[in-house]
A protein has these predicted regions:
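Short, exposed beta-strand/loop patches in secreted or surface proteins that constitute
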Residues: 8-11
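N-terminal glycine-rich phosphate-binding loop for ADP-containing cofactors
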Residues: 2-3, 22, 74-79, 85, ...
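A structural preference for short, pocket-lining loop segments at secondary-structure junctions
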Residues: 14-22, 32-74, 85-99, 119-123, ...
């Protein structure tokens, strides 16, 4: 006997009913899928021939989560809880058969099944935290009852995906069945349950792990303390913790009510709206209107790296990590040896944390070859230059590479600000020159700015984007302008920060406001970390800026124990009376009278200047879309994901309010400051950046 609808099939094989869901691409819990589960389970329960039920999915995965497109819309069809109740209250055992991923609502459905079987490659998780949400279909109440409060907290606040073997050890999965034999294995497991007379296991009725957690009253306080830095500013992790506290201390149904209340709080929050926006923006950023997905690319099987310093070594690690050999070229053996030693030390530190084996370290180091001869890059498919940020030096390198490297290979510059068009004039293959701006530390930071010159070919762009994806980066396309997307906006903020320094705000005042907003650090702490002497020369220094005076006093940042801040032996920063005196002296020379600069003004002038510059970047078509700017700032500069990026944040403030404030600050913004015509026009028309696709 078989019953079929558009997204499911129900068949009875012997005494086992098999309910198969088929809603490509990931069997998300849309209204038709929820209806299919409810109807299918009820039909199987009503069928006297069926003694047990297997819930399985066609395609590449089990239910991979909620249908995000339904968020914020009027509900259609049955509620997920109705389908879950049908499963949990079935008088016949229901077995979830898991392959691919059981994520979010998918795992929450599986948790309502009495037993769970999975293939070895399957993964389970509750990643709602990444969307600024919590598991809202009983996950916060059922998961702790299976794996315990501590493991549940860790899984839900990190959103991690757990492999089948670990799931079995945790009790999240009851049976591992052979790869490729899920259907037969799950049916066999169901028959085994019937033969052994195993009871119906309702997770909601399991209480032993909750009793154990009640015996550890310090558990939640310790978890909050241990993760305070990681959770700073986010709403969802705290709400997840409160839900697990409810699971431990309240009856199941009261815990569910708590979960629902806290879920709805998050669903209607700006934080979750921002994180969901970022989720889609990270998928949109790869789409380049005039470079379709089927654009031919260069097959990158060997990479050349010119420069083995901090950036060059970090970039090389990205390729070694994915099995692509790299030849690193330096001008001196000492620099080459030092660069390779730093790479090895980085890998060994990772191995000490248990994330790599000793064999992994040697395998990756084996893919890295050092050289002092550019000729060794002749057969590379992609060569990336990461030398000193000087135009003439870069052009000299590119001229040599053009003569050496095989035709058709891509020549890329890691420049953070210089003109790619000018660099390209040094070669005969201008169409093969592209910017690939990695962010430091390059082996850690997710962002890659791909910079398109006037003559850069679509093939070169497609190759650079594909390479970014291959090495695990998020690549955003930028046009040519000083600083590209990220650093150009950073400069606009820096101008305001420096101006407010000369109006009476101290570095720690400005940094403190931006830190409280959610950024990892402010501009002055960032300068101290990078080193104030970057681009500074003792020979040409004229005490004309606060930074020059600090460098002349050997206050060059964290590395010298002092910069804008004073640092102790552990590099903890504290306000510096020396810096304050220098600032006051500069103000006196300029005839400036110190005033109290409010926190509101600090935040608005810094952020609204960024927004204004972002609008100019859009006007000039340097960035394809506003969300690309947000992706750059979230992944390259630590802009808090729960704020959505500077352009999304502008929408939450209201573009009319942004323009009004910029007009009110007027001359304070600087003599050369102008409001973007695009920003002004969008404000007048009541538009939002997030509506610009």
């Amino acid at each position: 006997m078989a019953a079929t609808d558009s997204v499911s099939t129900l068949v009875v094989e012997g005494d086992i009913a098999v309910l198969t869901l088929n809603s490509p691409p990931v069997n998300a819990l849309s209204a038709p899928v929820r209806q299919a589960i409810l109807d299918g389970i009820n039909a199987a329960v009503a069928n006297p021939a069926a003694k047990a039920i297997v819930l399985i999915c066609d395609g590449r995965t089990f239910i991979a989560g909620a249908d995000i497109s339904e968020f914020g819309k009027a509900p259609k069809g049955p509620a997920l809880q109705d389908a879950q109740n049908a499963i949990e209250n079935s008088p016949k055992p229901v077995v979830a058969a898991i392959h691919g991923t059981a994520l979010g609502g998918g795992l929450e459905v599986a948790l309502c099944c009495h037993y769970r079987a999975a293939v070895p490659s399957a993964k389970c998780g509750l990643p709602e935290v990444n969307l600024g949400l919590l598991p809202g279909a009983g996950g916060t109440q059922r998961l702790p009852r299976i794996v315990g409060a501590e493991k549940a907290l860790d899984m839900m606040t990190t959103g991690q995906h757990v492999g089948a073997k670990q799931c079995l050890a945790m009790g999240l999965v009851d049976e591992i069945v052979p790869e490729g034999e899920l259907r037969a294995g799950a049916i066999a497991f169901a028959k085994k349950l019937l033969a052994e007379g195993r009871p119906l296991k309702k997770v909601r009725d399991s209480d032993d792990k909750m009793v154990a957690a009640r015996g550890k009253p310090e558990l939640f306080a310790e978890f909050r303390k241990a993760n305070a830095r990681k959770f700073r500013g986010f709403l969802a992790p705290e709400n997840i913790i409160r839900c697990v506290e409810a699971a431990v201390n309240l009856p199941f149904d009261e815990g569910l009510a708590t979960e629902r209340k806290l879920f709805l709080e998050l669903l209607t929050s700006t934080h979750s709206a921002a994180q969901r926006y970022v989720f889609f923006a990270e998928r949109q950023v790869w789409k380049i209107p005039d470079v379709p997905e089927d654009t031919p690319t260069v097959a990158v099987k060997k990479v050349g790296m010119v420069g083995a310093g901090t950036m060059g070594g970090g970039i090389a690690m990205n390729f070694a990590n994915v099995g692509i050999p790299v030849t690193l070229v330096e001008t001196k053996q000492e620099a080459l040896d030092r660069g390779l030693a730093v790479i090895r030390r980085n890998y060994e530190n990772t191995a000490k944390k248990g994330k790599l084996t000793a064999e992994d370290v040697e395998k990756r180091m084996g893919l890295l070859k050092g050289s002092m001869n550019l000729e060794d890059l002749a057969d590379c498919d992609l060569v990336i230059e990461a030398v000193f940020e000087n135009m003439q030096i870069k052009k000299d390198v590119f001229g040599k590479l053009d003569r050496i490297v095989k035709p058709g290979a891509i020549l890329a510059s890691n420049t953070s600000a210089l003109n790619i068009n000018e660099i390209a004039t040094a070669v005969s293959r201008e169409d093969g020159v592209v910017g690939m701006h990695f962010f430091s530390p390059a082996n850690v930071m997710r962002l890659l700015e791909v910079v398109r010159g006037d003559r850069t070919s679509k093939k070169a762009i497609a190759t650079a984007m594909q390479v970014g994806k291959k090495v695990g980066k998020i690549a955003a396309l930028s046009g040519v302008c000083p600083g590209f997307i990220g650093n150009r906006i950073l400069y606009a903020r820096t101008v305001q920060a420096q101006a407010m320094l000369m109006e009476g705000a101290m570095p720690w005042d400005i940094d403190g406001v931006l830190y409280d907003f959610g950024l990892p650090m402010g501009p002055f702490a960032m300068s101290d970390l990078a080193g104030l002497d970057i681009g500074w020369s003792k020979e040409t220094s004229k005490s004309s800026t606060i930074r020059e005076v600090l460098c002349e006093m050997d206050r060059r940042g964290q590395k010298t124990g002092a910069g804008y801040y004073d640092y102790d032996e552990k590099r903890n920063a504290k306000p510096s009376p020396v810096t304050e005196k220098i600032v006051r002296d500069f103000m006196a020379k300029a005839g400036a009278t110190p005033r109290v600069v409010s926190k509101e003004e600090i935040l608005e002038r810094c952020l609204f200047a960024m927004i204004n510059e972002g609008a100019k970047i859009l006007e000039e078509k340097i960035a394809i879309r506003p969300s690309d700017i947000d992706i750059v700032w979230i992944n390259g500069y630590g802009f808090p994901v729960y704020r959505g990026g500077p352009m999304f944040y502008a929408d939450t403030v209201g573009l009319k309010n942004v323009v009004a404030k910029l007009e009110a600050y007027g001359p304070k913004m600087g003599a050369s400051f102008t409001i973007s015509p695009l920003l002004r026009r969008m404000a007048e028309e009541g538009k939002r950046f997030q509506d610009v696709k």
